[in-house]
Structure formats: C-alpha cells, structure tokens
C-alpha cells in the first residue's frame, strides 16, 4: 500500500474520533483552526486584524488554481456551490436543455429545476455521454457522486459535448483534494471548499474558461467584483474585474483564513500522494467488506457506500466511528488523516 507517513500527517490534526466522513465535511488542520481562532479573537477584541485579510483570499485563489490546473484569473471565490450553479442556470436561454445524471447532488440540479422554462433531462451516470444530443445546451454533473463514490467518465462526456456543441459544468466537490482533477477542459467547474480541501463552510470555488466568461452575468456583483474594488465601494462600478473575479462573492473570512493553511498542506503533500493514500485505504476497506459478506457500490474512489447498512450509522457513531447514512447506504470516506487502523476499527465494529 502506498500510504502517507501516519504520524507526520496525523500530527497536523487534532480530531479525537475515528473520522471517516470527509465526504460530508473535512477535518480542519491544526494550523487552520489556529488561523480561525486568531481572526475570531481579533474580531471579538474590536481591532482591525479582525476585519479579515483580502491578501489571504488571493493566496487561497492562487493555491486552488494550482491544484486544479488553471490560471489564477479563471477562479472566482464564493460561499456556496449552489450560488455559482445558479449563475450558470440564469445564463441559459429559455428552452435550453440541461442533461444531468440521475440522483446527482441537489446543488447541481436544483438551480436548473427551479426554472420552468428549461428542459432538464436525466440519464444514468454510466450512459451519460450517450445521452448527449444535438439539443443539449449544458451537461451538469458531479465528478464523483456524493451518495456512493461513483466516478464520472469526464473524458467521455467531454467528447460527447464537444461533438454536439454543448457546454459542461463539473462539480468537483467530491474530487478536488484527493483526485488529480484538471478543471481546464471544462467551461465551468465548482467545488465546495469544506470537504476534501479541508477548509470550513463558507468557502467555494468557481472556475470559468476564458471562452465561456462572457456567457455569464455577475448577477450578485458587489464591490469585490470590480477591477479596482477599493475604488468601487460606493456608487455604480465602472469596470468589472477582467477575469473570473467578477463572479466573486464577498468572502466569508473565517473560512478563507482556514483555507490558506489547508491548501498549503495539500500542496506540500501533493495530490498524487493523497490520491494513492486515500484509495489504498478504500481498497483495504472494500476487501474487508467482502470478507464480511457485504457488497459495496463498485468503484475506486475513497468514498465507499454499502447498500442496506445505513441503519448502522448511529451505533457506529456511539462507538466513536464517524460515518454517514446516504441514500440508504452506509458511507465511509477516507482522507489523508486516516490510517489502516481506522479502516480496521470500522470493519471490527461492523463485524461485532
């Protein structure tokens, strides 16, 4: 198994449980907790350091851009994935067809569903590329399914959308941070920052290709959307930021102060190394499940879901093992702070 040095990585975190629920929310590294505490204490003391630091937000933008392989000016920062998806939905002409996988996460689907002048069509994830047709304007999908860890054939869907002149929106919330994910082939990508990217809630990312930028209107443009934001705090803005920053929301500083050290940790370790570690743990768990007579949803992601075992989640939590119940499945998700001992503890609990 290609695992990260357990003690070196575990020392970056202070959790006291067997935490196997990154697909819901990641564990904040110690350094991220310290930054949040410093900002909160400064805000409580009524000193300027409590205002929040835009330079830190820019460093987070730069780090995320490196992780997903795009230029910094292609990244917008926000607070929630659904807000960014809403921008994309609002930009579609009436009558447009949007294709989504069956059962995908609600934030990927609902911003299109609430428009009664769009045609939203669904297809099984495994045959999504075949479902793209000449009337398809946009395919919106998660790179990795939240409920069960199934991984999309993004290259196949991209080939199909290119052939039919359709755009793609990829939600990388369950991919970025463990999967080597390249956002550059897609018109739009979104990602929540509080899962595998190890920040807190209130952090999300939107990437927009240069070619697709003019397809979107920055409907929630505030002063941070201006090219010179400090000169745009009052009155109408005179010029939007030249890049994707025009789609920024005013940052939730506590989250972005946490995101800085979290992304720095991921970059220091390397996403390839995290990928090898996380998937090795998932493989160990899958093998153990087979020995116990359980059959998980097939796949190779570090999100492993077992149909029919969702009812065990409460007892596991009482035993200090944190998992999730999703779509009738018991879902365990493994990240850089987990070890083989964590996997074995879960298996032993399921056997008992």
Residue ranges and their predicted role:
Residues 1-352:
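Pyridoxal 5′-phosphate
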């Amino acid at each position: 198994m290609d695992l990260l040095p357990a003690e070196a990585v575990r020392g970056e975190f202070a959790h006291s449980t067997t935490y196997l629920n990154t697909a819901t929310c990641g564990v904040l590294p110690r350094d991220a907790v310290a930054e949040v505490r410093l900002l909160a204490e400064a805000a409580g003391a009524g000193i300027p350091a409590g205002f929040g630091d835009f330079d830190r937000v820019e460093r987070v933008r730069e780090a995320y851009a490196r992780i997903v392989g795009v230029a910094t000016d292609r990244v917008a920062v926000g607070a929630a994935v659904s807000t960014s998806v809403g921008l994309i939905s609002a930009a579609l002409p009436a009558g447009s067809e949007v294709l989504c996988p069956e059962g995908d996460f609600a934030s990927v689907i609902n911003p299109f569903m609430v428009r009664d002048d769009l045609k939203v069509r669904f297809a099984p994830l495994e045959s999504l590329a075949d479902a793209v047709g000449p009337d398809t304007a946009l395919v919106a999908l998660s790179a990795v399914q939240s409920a069960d860890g199934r991984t999309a054939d993004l290259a196949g869907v991209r080939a199909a959308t290119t052939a039919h002149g359709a755009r793609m929106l990829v939600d990388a919330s369950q991919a970025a941070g463990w999967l080597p994910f390249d956002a550059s082939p897609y018109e739009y990508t979104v990602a929540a920052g509080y899962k595998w990217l190890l920040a807190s809630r209130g952090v999300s990312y939107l990437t927009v290709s240069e070619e697709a930028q003019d397809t979107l209107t920055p409907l929630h443009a505030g002063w941070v959307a201006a090219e010179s934001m400090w000169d745009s705090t009052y009155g109408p803005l005179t010029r939007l930021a030249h890049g994707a920053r025009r789609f920024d929301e005013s940052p939730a500083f506590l989250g972005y102060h946490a995101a800085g050290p979290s992304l720095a940790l991921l970059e220091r370790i390397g996403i390839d190394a995290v990928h090898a570690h996380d998937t090795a743990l998932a493989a160990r768990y899958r093998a153990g499940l087979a020995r116990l007579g359980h059959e998980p949803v097939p796949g190779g992601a570090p999100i492993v879901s077992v149909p029919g075992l969702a009812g065990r989640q409460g007892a596991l939590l009482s035993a200090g093992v944190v998992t999730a119940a999703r779509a009738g499945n018991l879902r365990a998700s493994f990240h850089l702070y987990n070890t083989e001992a964590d996997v074995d503890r879960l298996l032993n609990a399921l056997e008992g």
